[in-house]
Structure formats: C-alpha cells, structure tokens
Amino acid sequence: GVTLQRSRYDEPYQWDDDAPAEKKMFRTPNTYGYFTATYTPIKPLTIALSGTYTGSMLVQRAAISAENAAMGEMPERPAVALMTPDFFDLGIKAAYDFKFCKSTVFQLNAGIQNIFQAYQKDFDRGANRDSNYIYGPATPRSFFAGVKISY
C-alpha cells in the first residue's frame, strides 16, 4: 500500500516562541508505503519479506538554554523545525513446519528486522535532552528466532 498526502495547517502554527511558525503539519510524511510478500518454495518452508517506507517529515527540536547546556551533555541551541531523512525498514522471516500426527505442527522460525539499520542517528542525550525528538523506526537491526506449536 502507498499513501501520498500533503498535510498543512490553514494558518501557520506557532509551536515555539523563538521558532518561525510552520504551515506544514509535524510528523506527517507526504509519502508512506508498505509491502509484504510470502514465498513457499516447498510445502513446509515459508519465506516472508516485509518493508515499510516512511518519507521525510518535519519534526520539532526544542531549544536548550545555556543554563541547561552547562548542566547536561547537549550544547546550547535554538528551537528549530527540521526535515528528517526518509527511512526504509526491511525485514525477512523464514519458517519451517514439522508435522506430527495428523493435526500437530511444530514450527521453527528466524529472521531479521530492520536489515538496513534504518534508524535515527541524532538522538539527544543526557538529563536535558528533548525527549520528544524521536522519529523513524523504533528499533535498530535485530535478529529473532522462535518456536510455534499448533494443534
């Protein structure tokens, strides 16, 4: 599926006293898409591929005052609205079914989520960080394995 949109305020939105007002809505990419594909090369083996594309979007980054910068790990900076990079999050899963008796299936599966390590690179750190400055996929590349029993 694909979503193409353009989200704007009727009047510019003043989100911070020191930052310019914005007509673009925050955290709403103009382009978003996803897909899933499943391939079964032999009856007990299934391979699934899934992906999500999130286009660039406008996000708010709060100011850090000189006083707060002196107490934490982040440098002083003004409030600013930034365009994020776009992200493509791809995952793969392989599953193999072992049949026991007539109605019992034991499945082994494994896979990788976020294969390309599409992940925010500029997190704020420390006690005075902007905890709302988060965008993009929620987890870095991860590996998983599982067992499923159906009866």
Which sequence ranges carry the predicted segments?
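Gram-negative outer-membrane beta-barrel transporters
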Residues: 1-66, 119
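Residues embedded in well-ordered secondary-structure elements
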Residues: 26, 38, 81-83, 99, ...
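Residues that define the transmembrane beta-barrel architecture of outer-membrane proteins
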Residues: 29-33, 86-90, 104, 139-143
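C-terminal beta-signal and adjacent terminal beta-strands/loops
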Residues: 44, 53-67, 96-151
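Charged, glycine/proline-rich intrinsically disordered loops and linkers
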Residues: 67-75
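Outer-membrane beta-barrel transmembrane domain signature
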Residues: 79-89, 101, 151
